[in-house]
Amino acid sequence: MDKFTVHTGTTLAIMNDNIDTDQLLPKQFLKRLTKKGYEDALFFEWRYKEDGSNNPDFILNDPERQDASILITGDSFGIGSSREHAVWALRDWGFKAVIAGSFGPILYMNCTKNGVLPIELPKEARETLSKLTPTEQVTIDLPKQEVICGEHSWHFDINSSWKEKFLTGEDDIDQTMRYKDQISAYEVQISPYQ
């Protein structure tokens, strides 16, 4: 996982509430055996017409938003079935953070495990962020737990252990390996006849 301390980037807003994991990444893409290469499948049913061509009315197809790294969205983002692939698609598109009113709990955890920072902000803040032009930038300061845009700033909460994972770039296994010596000593203690 990449470290995340302070990120500055542009936004892309899909302000729908109740976006589920099947809308994020349809089931036909779950057969892939790799953890990378899902960017073209993100919001597949909304991004493409039935003939496979781009839907010009969908914001992910807006040429001015192709470098957006912060997704602004509605309430209950990522509800539905457990689908880690959906977070891989967000990450592969280039999103470093998703700002929503609330998250499906499984998607929230999958974000924290895959380096996409999930941030919950109130509707008024998200509405302000959703109106930004393609070139206006937003800064996310994780150490201060703030989202900053021009003269606006909003505080967000995050569990201290998840915050540490982002700040250090460590995943669950990396954090466990910090205790390798203690784990080995404990294993010797409980199995002295090895």
From Swiss-Prot:
CDD domains: IPMI_Swivel. It catalyses: (2R,3S)-3-isopropylmalate = (2S)-2-isopropylmalate. It comes from the Bacteria. Pathway: Amino-acid biosynthesis; L-leucine biosynthesis; L-leucine from 3-methyl-2-oxobutanoate: step 2/4. Catalyzes the isomerization between 2-isopropylmalate and 3-isopropylmalate, via the formation of 2-isopropylmaleate. NCBIfam families: leuD (TIGR00171), PRK01641.1 (NF002458). Belongs to the LeuD family. LeuD type 1 subfamily. This is 3-isopropylmalate dehydratase small subunit. The gene is leuD.
